[in-house]
Amino acid sequence: TRGATEGIYQSRGHYQQGMSCTGAARYVNQTGGILLRKDYGSIDLSTYNSSLGARHKIPNSIYKDEASKHQVKTISNIRAVEEARDALANGYSLSVCSGYGFSSVRDKNGVAKRSKGWSHAMAWIACDDSQEVYNETLFLVQNSWGKWNSGPKRLGQPDGSFWIREKDARGMLSGGGAWVFSDVDGFPARKIEWTIDEVF
């Protein structure tokens, strides 16, 4: 079952674009939770509709009561690359809000250079701490824009993703907008089975 993001957008408290990852974390952890991508009867969330959350059209019986059935019990603010690396190694991706923007063209190693800034949230989905490319830890960032960038890829990275260098990762994390989520009601933890040989 997929999650529906409209409730998170409704939690912003304003009708304009954008929000903070801190506000989103607070909603899924304290005042609401995660809504499911389905028809709730009084409101249909089976198909994404940005205006529902943006215009505060989700009734409280859904926005608060139904969402709280799938509340995130643990949220952690990540501020160091070591914390980000450890979270990813344990199967937790990060939601990172920052003003950092990156090139739409990856280099020969799948890395995107920092470019003009944008205020945006992106998922960090993997880490390469082998230090084989730039003698530093790299983080794999997945953007939500579909196949928006081009260039070589490495280690099976998905379309729309790019690796970032450690110095950029440190800068993004220093703003305090990076979060890891765990222990969600209704979604039991899954055992991760892998060996170091499967990673390389």
Name each region found by the language model:
Residues T1-S11:
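Acidic helix-start/capping segments at beta-turn-to-alpha-helix junctions
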Residues Y9-Q142, K147, G151-F200:
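Predominantly the structural core of cysteine protease catalytic domains
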